[in-house]
Amino acid sequence: MSDINEKSNFVFEFQPVTKLFEEQVRLHPDKCAVASSKESFTYAQLNERANRIANSLIEKGVGCEKIVGVVLERCCDFYAVRQGILKAGGAFAVAAPDYPDDRVQFIFEDAGVPFIITTKEIAKDRQELFSRLSCTVLLLEELLENPNAGNPDTRIKEHDLCYCIYTSGSTGKPKGVMIEHINLANFVNPNPKNAETYGYVSRGSVSLSMA
């Protein structure tokens, strides 16, 4: 097998996905980073929005091992929010906005989230649900108003928590699976031979798109 397979001298060295992303921002600031049917952001635009979110969260005390809940439709800012949480040093747990109230409540209470990020529209639609939760609801529109759009100086270690994903709960209560930064960094391995593609299509549930 070793004779058949192409050998590579590539050696994996850990870098958190936040730094890998910032490197792409430096290399390709004006290239499209994310696009939907309604809008698109370049790497520079996505990074700026993520930084405003990150700096807002840091000011509120988000840091290492703090899980932040996310309830958003699939949109370009969904990726800005995830990146912003990671840039703040936190981790994220996502619940799709069409999930039943009981499931959303279980996920966020089980994960112990201090904050949930959502939009004004979703907050209005799910007002009854959010009123039952003990965490603070943060509106995306307000987080994006933070004047500090610079990259946060956050140190992320290999085994810091990156995100928490929940099973369907079809055989009982949903179970949270903790994913560390080393796992995600290895998945998006920066070996150029593994990155020769323009991008990918994300069509699954927002709560499963990192699985």
Regions found by a protein language model. Give the residues of each.
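Carrier-protein-dependent adenylate-forming modules in NRPS/ANL systems
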Residues: M1-A185, A195-T197
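Residue-level recognition of the N-termini of beta-strands and the immediately preceding loop/turn
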Residues: K66, S202-R203
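Short, intrinsically disordered, charge-balanced linker/junction segments flanking boundaries
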Residues: G204-A211
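Low-complexity basic/metal-binding stretches
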Residues: P190-N194, Y198-Y200
